[in-house]
Every structure is written in C-alpha cells, then in structure tokens.
Amino acid sequence: MRVQPLNPAVGAAYWQGEAVGDSILLGGFSEVNKWIALRGWAYPHTLILPEAVQHRQVPQLVPEFLFYGFIFREGNFDFARKRVVRRLRLVGTPRQLERVRDILAVSYLGTAPEVLARIRPNEDIRPHLDREGAYFALKDDWGRIVPLEDYIELIPWGEDGTVTLDKSVTVARADEGAYEVRAEGETAPVKLAYDGDQPPVWQVPTGKADVPRRFGVHTLGSYDGFDPRGPSVSFIVWLDGHRVLLDCAPYADRLLEARGVSPECLDGIMITHIHEDHTGGLAAFAQVPKRLKLWTTPEIWRSIQIKLAAVLDRSVEDVANDFEFCPLPTDEPTTLFGIRVQAHYSCHSVPTIGIRFENDKDALTFTGDIAGRDYLDRMVQDGALAPERHALLMGRVYRTSGYVIADAGEALIHGYPKDHFGRSRVYLSHRSVTPVDGSFPPVLHPGYEIALDSGEVNAHDLSAIKAVLSQWGAKAHWRENLRRKSIVREFPPGSVIVSQGDTDTSYAYIISYGLCNVLVNKTLVAKLHEGEFFGEAAFLDERGIRNADVVAVSPVRLICVPGKVFRELLSDEVEHTSVEERLRKILKIRPTLQNSALFAGLPVTQLNELSLLADEVEVGPGDISKEAEKADVCFVVAEGSVNLTGANGHGTLGPSGVFGSGVTWRAGSVRPCPVRALRPTRLVRLPAGTLPELARRSPLVRHRIAHLSTRHR
C-alpha cells in the first residue's frame, strides 16, 4: 500500500485502493483538484477534512471542485436514471462537517429554498432566482430537486479518533495534522502539517507589470476551475485611473504580486458570484492591512459571508467586518470613479451578475457566467426564463456595443464560443483553447490587456510623487520640482536597485508602479509598492551608506530623485518641522513598530504614519500602570522589559512587545493588566485613539488585537 503526496510541499496526500474508485484524499486546500487532474488520478471517493484553517493565507477546507469532480466528472450522477450513484464521503469533526455543508449548500444549491432563506433576495429578483435555479437543479424521477444529503455522506470521527471506511480501510487521527491509513494489512503514516509554501499547480506568470490605465482591463486568469494549466477567472479593471479587482480566483494575491500590485494598491474588489473559481482568493484579502471595498449585490454579498465564514471558521458577523460592502444596483446604472456601471443578473446556477463599464468614448462588458444562448431560448419555451429577462440578457450579452469578455465554459450553466461567432471586439473567458475556426473570438490568456484609454503614465508618476510628499510633509511646489528634475527609470524583476553597504547618495527613489523587496542582511524586512519611497537613509547617514538591499519583485518604474535635489528638499520646513526631522523620526521609530507582533507586515506607508504620530517614553524600574491604563493607548517596547500581571499569571515583554489598554484586554470584558518596568526601559507610545482608528481601517490589525487581548488576559 502506498500513500502518494500530491507534491513534496503541498500538504495533502492521496490513497488509492485496489477497487476502482476506492480512493481517499487527506487534505483539501485551494485548487487541490487541479493537482489531482495534473496527476491524472480519479477524484477521491473520501475526503479527510484537514485540521488547519489556512496555511500562509491559503484556505485548507475547499471541497467545492472536489465535489463537482466526483459527482459529475467521475460519473456519480446517473443522468439517464436520475439518481446519485455514489455519495462523496467527508470525514471530520462536527464543526468541520457543519462548515463543509455550508460551503456546498451555498455554492452548489445557491438558489434552493434553504439558501434563499439565508441570502434574502429582494422581491424583484427572488421569483427569477427561484424559477431559473429550479430549472438548472438536477431532479429525480418524481421531479424533486435532489437534496445535498443525497450527494454527500458526512462522517464524524469516532470517539477513539478513527473512522472505518468500507470493510478493510480505517483512517486514524494521530498528532495534529498527522494520520494513519490502515488497509490491506498495512499501515501508512501521513503528515499534512509542514512549514513550506503551498503553491498553485500552475506557474505564476511573471515579467509583466500592471501599467496604470485610465480605462482598461488586465487579465490575471481566465482558465476554468478544473484546468491545471493556468489560473481561474480574475481581472484588473482600470476605472479612470483606479484599480479594481474583478473576481478573485484562488491565489489572486500571488497573481497581483507578480504584476507588482499589493492589496493596498487596490481601490476595491468586485465579485460576480461565489463559485470557487471566482472567489477562492478572497480569504487572503480578509486579513490584509487595508480594509477593501467590495462591490456586489446584497444577495451575493450575503452568500460570500456564509461561504467565507465557513472557509475561515469564523462568524458571519466577523467576516463581514473584513470588507466594506458597497451595494451594486441591478435595476439602474451607477457611477464609480467617473465610469458608468450597469450590473444585471445573469442566468446561472447561483446568483450571478454581468457588468458593463462605460465612459464617453467606449465600453467594456463582462457577461458573467451565463448559460448558453440556445439554452436560454429553451428556458423561455419551458417557462423557466421570463421573456423580459430573456430580452434583457440578449441585449446586455449578445447585442451590446464595445468590448465584451464572454463566458465560454461550454457546460449546462456556461456559454459557448458559437454564441459569439463572427462578432468583433469579443474575447472568450472561462476556457484555455480558442476554437480552430478563425471566425470565433480569441481566448483571453493571463497577461493580455485591453486598453480602452491608456491615459498618461506621467499622471501616475505625479500621483506617486504627491503621495510621498504628503508623507514627508513637504510644501506643494516640490511636486512640480521633483517631476521636472527627477529621472524615470524602469527595472525588470530581480534587479538589485540599491545594495546594502554601498556608499552611494546619487538618488533617492519613489515607486511609480511595481513591487520591491527590502532586505537587511539578506532577510526580508519589508515590501514596497507604488507611492512609497526608499534610499533616504543614506542621505541621513553621515557616511552615506545604504542600509538595505532593494530588489525588484516585478517590473518596476522608479522616479529617481537626484541627490542634490533631495538634499534641498530635506531642509524644506512646514510648521517648524523640516522634512529631514520627519524622516529621522521615521527611521528611529519605524523599526520598533516593524518588529512588533501587532504592526509587523503593515505597509511602510502605514508604519511611517504611525511613526510620526508616536513619541518615545523613557521609564525607570517601577510602576507604569497608570500610564498604560489610559484609554486606547498602545505601547511597544523599544529597549528594556516590562512585566504584565493578568488573569493568566505573570508575563514579561521585551523589545517589540506590545501592551496598553487597546491591546491587553477587550473593552469592558476584563480589568486592565498591571504593568511595571523591570529595568530602564524605552517605549514607543501611540496616542489615544490611534489604535481604534487603525483597527477600523485594517482587518489585519483588528484580528491581531483580538489575539493579543486574549493572550494578555
């Protein structure tokens, strides 16, 4: 007997028995089905649900496409006899089984009565969702919609931590993340816990930056959810110079990073529907430093909350706070960043929207996932699609002007290339291969761009300069000075722009677009994105020594400020504080914040802002409880140590330790922890009100505060 790892580093394993279809998958992380497809293995009959929730921001409980593959691709629904042949077995704790049922219910039975009761569609759209969803749903001989329980078998672990599958196969839980498969008289140990990366099965496309546009689209992925050759559906849409992520496929954060885009550079996310190949990457954006806007309809938003809460094992109310929900109307157009936006409900197995973006010169339509044209005609004949809905879809999808990105996934609930035969300015999505006949529209591949209005890259340069001057506190006239006197250079990925230890004050740098890593002694300490700066430290060091390596992660466009110009700028003074004084304060305080459990990983822009707000406090050995008890005050230990006394006993915090009323307890739940300095100690103090405001803007900080407050009780 042999248990096969999917890949040496992915944290899942596959067991194949002697009987056809007798297989077990241990672990179910994002896009694990694509690893199975790459190996040419059958979809597993049994899924052992993993104990981990996330690994390096990759969700671990993602059963959706494993379910679709087992039921449909393995032929476990008999369409002739209208019944399920074999049920997918899911093994886990009661809580895991509850979560996986929520995910499958809202994703597969997205318009079933039990789901509609939870997502509460408005009265105008509910009849359409009811009727169209029922038409797509598989039914038995009596015309009854096949319920989820007919497709899956939920199996809890036994009290002894084992479960017996069939006659001779037993799976046992060992240590955390470890199992044993016992079959055929043999035992095979399986360990899922590991420290490595969990990459996608496909190669992340590199070498191309997301160049700013006034109006256009940049394809991150357009493959379907089963194809292991590439990423699923995600696009960057530029709306009057604002960057919006349209749909959020698994590993979308990595696709963005390869294009030089961090989450903080997004102006928001727009979601068409909740299927995994369109939302599998959302979990990574639920705990980022910036609370992102999320545009969709109220029905789809409530579906997202249900699914994301189950994936992350959190409450619906909690995940709702990770994004700023912005309702997208479907009954009338709205305006977003100066662009006219018209959304409409598509015709799919779950609530889905198509979207049209339009300025005064051109238009761009995303059809959203939608049933094929012939199928829509048949639905009208069968009374499942109202004539007015059919007319609306024909106009919005097949007779619209401008560019069209069309679903051509070729299935019951997807469109077909022939639906757009002979049309110009149409591109196919949800597939990887263009039909041979040249009259069919081409397929969008990762990296393909459509520029409806390129605009001026110089305008983006000016925006980056303005953002940096705002941080520096420099006068407004410096914006034009830097634009005229600086040099613009572009660097490919892997370029070492400055090297630690070099004596060089030729330039200070502002990033117009792209992403850079900052390394000190070859250790990554920060990532820099557009609107951030580097190279200033050498000008503040009397020896002119560079204190870090800065390496381009993606193609990078830099505004290189000559040393002479930068030295003049350092002496600029606003409200009795020079730029040099502000930068020196940032360089002194930022490392303390950067190394703390609460603020590590925040964008450098946010760390700079906090550094300028903070001050330093020197305390000798003794009681500093009164200072620490002030409302919403936060301290970070820079040097020395303090002792905290809480309900869980004593604790000592050294350098980078965080304490204060905002982090050591939840307001009103427990009394403050007494705090005492153990030796001469230097503290960085953030003023009252800073932390609540930061937590409101940053899901990452909010979650960390909750974690720290529990630890310090």
Question: Across the structure, where does each feature detected by a protein language model lie?
Answer:
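Conserved beta-strand hairpin/beta-sheet module of binuclear metal-dependent hydrolase folds
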Residues: 1-147, 152, 161-259, 352-373
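Catalytic core of the metallo-beta-lactamase
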Residues: 330-384
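Active-site neighborhood of phospho(di)ester-bond hydrolases with catalytic His/Asp-centered motifs
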Residues: 26, 245-249, 265-277, 295-297, ...
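Metallo-beta-lactamase
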Residues: 138-165, 194-196, 203, 298-352, ...
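Di-metal (Zn2+ and/or Mg2+/Mn2+) metal-binding site signature of metallo-dependent hydrolases
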Residues: 255, 261-289
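Active-site environment of divalent metal-dependent phosphoester hydrolases
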Residues: 226, 274-280, 302-303, 332, ...
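Cytosolic regulatory regions built on CNB/CRP/Popeye-like sensor folds
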Residues: 440, 451-713
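Binuclear metal-ion centers of metallo-dependent hydrolases, dominated by the metallo-beta-lactamase
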Residues: 1-37, 52-53, 331, 398-400, ...
